């Protein structure tokens, strides 16, 4: 099918998100193409384990891949999309900090002073007004309340 939709699903989990996703990166790419999408983001929970596999599968099939992650903390979650290689490197650093620190705080990690621009190359989407305020206070712009239509990419059975 020829890609016709300008809609881009951003909150997509593969089986790399244990208990949250069941599809392989290849199956996600195939389903996106069946739905007429031209682009798809893979945003597994707290990891990038299958990012390269997804990226390669998408490029092979002519789908524009977006890489990102859903970073979760005890109180909040943020959907982070990489804009470029620098963003991917910064997301890797954030995920490392998240894994090493049980009290990880996204706003503090993005505002740290040991790295000049920890949020460079990243789009940060949050639903929590508190997290959005913390990010803005730290000088990090965040999009708030961005929603998808859940039926747009899901099949009749609700899955990809």
Segments (PLM) and residue ranges:
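Phosphodiester-processing cores and adjacent nucleic acid-binding clamps
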Residues: 1-160
């Amino acid at each position: 099918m020829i890609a016709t939709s300008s809609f881009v699903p951003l909150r997509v989990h593969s089986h790399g998100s244990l208990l949250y996703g069941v599809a392989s990166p290849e199956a996600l790419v195939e389903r996106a193409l069946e739905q007429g999408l031209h682009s798809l983001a893979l945003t597994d929970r707290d990891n990038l384990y299958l990012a390269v596999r997804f990226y390669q599968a998408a490029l092979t099939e002519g789908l524009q891949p977006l890489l990102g992650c859903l970073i979760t903390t005890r109180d909040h979650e943020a959907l982070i999309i990489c804009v470029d290689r620098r963003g991917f490197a910064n997301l890797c650093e954030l995920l490392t900090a998240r894994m090493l620190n049980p009290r990880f705080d996204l706003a503090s990690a993005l505002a740290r002073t040991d790295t000049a621009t920890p949020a460079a190359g990243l789009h940060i989407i949050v639903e929590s007004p508190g997290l959005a305020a913390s990010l803005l206070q730290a000088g990090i712009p965040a999009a708030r309340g961005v929603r998808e239509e859940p039926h747009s990419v899901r099949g009749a059975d609700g899955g990809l």
